[in-house]
């Protein structure tokens, strides 16, 4: 989409900044719960904080050594992400198709995600009589065999959102959106 990421550490080199990242999102290996943090800038005022971080990181027994090696390989290897996010790329096409189709369903709207592999559509709860988003996603799963996650599962306080993952192939996204549309045609809690 032409968006450019600016590292906050580069914007304020005189301040201590902490940057977090991980394999799951940055390197498309969902489920690999391996991450890291980098501290930049003057660290002398944060000595106690850094010692605490060091202590916490040393408390884990049985470190996930294979995943630690995966980080090194990921950071030092060929960076293929542009092949997926530029026009014609799989992740961009999947995101665009999911966003296009979800916004064609009456009473459902969504902002186009930028940099995420998820969407968080809003559903008109009055139109569909939804008062329990957990029941909504459960009913959808039972009737149409489509799994979404209720918005309240992400600390959203109203039952008017749900989460969609945009990682499946386009044909599966199309099928899921067709099933959601069919489900909503006669759904009312």
Language-model regions, residue ranges each:
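Conserved core segment of the aminotransferase class I/II
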Residues: 10-89, 99-100, 184
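PLP-dependent enzyme catalytic core of the Aspartate aminotransferase-like
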Residues: 129-131, 139-148, 154-189
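Short beta-strand segments
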Residues: 21-22, 36, 112, 120-122, ...
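A short linear hydrophobic-aromatic micro-motif
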Residues: 19, 106-110, 147-153
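Conserved glycine-rich beta-strand-loop-beta hairpin in the small C-terminal domain of fold type I
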Residues: 72, 88-102, 110-124, 158
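Residue-level recognition of strand-loop junctions within catalytic nucleotide-signaling folds
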Residues: 40-41, 76, 122-124, 167-169
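Conserved PLP phosphate-binding loop immediately N-terminal to the Schiff-base lysine helix
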Residues: 1-8
């Amino acid at each position: 989409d032409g968006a450019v990421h600016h590292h906050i550490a580069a914007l304020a080199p005189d301040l201590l900044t902490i940057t977090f990242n991980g394999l799951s999102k940055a390197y498309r290996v969902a489920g690999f719960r391996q991450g890291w943090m980098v501290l930049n800038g003057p660290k002398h005022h944060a000595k106690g904080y850094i010692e605490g971080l060091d202590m916490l990181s040393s408390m884990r027994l049985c470190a996930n050594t294979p995943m630690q090696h995966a980080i090194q390989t990921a950071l030092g290897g060929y960076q293929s992400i542009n092949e997926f996010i530029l026009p014609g790329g799989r992740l961009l096409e999947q995101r665009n198709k999911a966003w296009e189709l979800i916004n064609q369903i009456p009473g459902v709207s969504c902002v186009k995600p930028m940099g995420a592999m998820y969407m968080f559509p809003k559903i008109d709860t009055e139109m569909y009589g939804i008062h329990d988003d957990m029941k909504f996603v459960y009913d959808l799963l039972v009737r149409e065999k489509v799994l979404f996650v209720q918005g309240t599962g992400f600390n959203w306080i109203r039952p008017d959102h749900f989460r969609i993952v945009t990682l499946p192939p386009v044909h599966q996204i199309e099928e899921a959106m067709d099933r959601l549309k069919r489900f909503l045609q006669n759904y009312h809690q």
